[in-house]
């Protein structure tokens, strides 16, 4: 697959992440979801003069190649193909016991949305895939074409917060096999009432696609697992920063930050400015939450 080395993607809440995550300029920081390297580069730039270093990980081998290209000029960055739920394994291999900051951006990267054949976007006609880790077996095609109707409906309702989940699940089952993203969009369109198709602020397929993507990549399970162990890998005073894009993730993060005795929340969540949303519309639903290791 051809990869476009895009040096102009826009990281979400970039300044807010850098200003709040970096408290020790000579420290060790981990970007747990490197993507195309925007946050990683900004962190590396800030800590480089002080001898600070950045460990970057991502589960997507294709997007990691783009990050490698974009970060060539930063000698204080090391990149690895790992999932953030595998962080303890990587830190053990690197003989790093604790770090000073952890960042997780739970959004989909620009590359993943636009790259041919990945199946993340409803704006293109592609095979139903949606895997962030291309080595995983579970795809959107498998979910759409094999899951029982009730299970599909629950996923669309719980992960997509879609009120018409039962109607959509029934339509999916009735129209199997569904091969491509465009076919799935048409099925969703026919399942929804007219006003839901034409009057929603976002595209009518957004919630269903989000739900399927979350199921494919086990996103809720992964962030829950990560939050269980992450505080143990932070030095005292270390920062944990999580960017979420929908209320289900944010509720989990908020609950842990409030109730985990190892952590102290830093203020309330941070939202993008009106200017940032105008420049980068996909930032509109982002929330940054921060906590400090006690």
Curated annotation (Swiss-Prot):
InterPro entries the UniProt entry points to: RsmH, SAM-dep_MeTrfase_MraW_recog, SAM-dependent_MTases_sf
Catalytic reaction annotation: cytidine(1402) in 16S rRNA + S-adenosyl-L-methionine = N(4)-methylcytidine(1402) in 16S rRNA + S-adenosyl-L-homocysteine + H(+)
GO BP of this protein: rRNA base methylation
GO cellular component assignments: cytoplasm
EC code(s) of this entry: 2.1.1.199
Disulfide bonds: none
Amino acids binding S-adenosyl-L-methionine: 37-39, 58, 93, 105, 112
Keyword annotations of the record: Cytoplasm, Methyltransferase, rRNA processing, S-adenosyl-L-methionine, Transferase
Source organism superkingdom: Bacteria
Subcellular location: Cytoplasm
CDD domains: AdoMet_MTases
Annotated transmembrane regions: none
Enzyme class label: transferase
Positions in coiled-coil regions: none
Gene3D superfamilies hit by this protein: Putative methyltransferase TM0872, insert domain (1.10.150.170), Vaccinia Virus protein VP39 (3.40.50.150)
GO terms for MF: rRNA (cytosine-N4-)-methyltransferase activity
Major localisation: cytoplasm
HAMAP family in alphabetical order: 16SrRNA_methyltr_H (MF_01007)
Entries under NCBIfam families matching the protein: 16S rRNA (cytosine(1402)-N(4))-methyltransferase RsmH
Entry's family note: Belongs to the methyltransferase superfamily. RsmH family.
Matches recorded under PANTHER family: 12S RRNA N4-METHYLCYTIDINE METHYLTRANSFERASE, S-ADENOSYL-METHYLTRANSFERASE MRAW
Entry function: Specifically methylates the N4 position of cytidine in position 1402 (C1402) of 16S rRNA.
Protein name: Ribosomal RNA small subunit methyltransferase H
Species the sequence originates in: Fervidobacterium nodosum (strain ATCC 35602 / DSM 5306 / Rt17-B1)
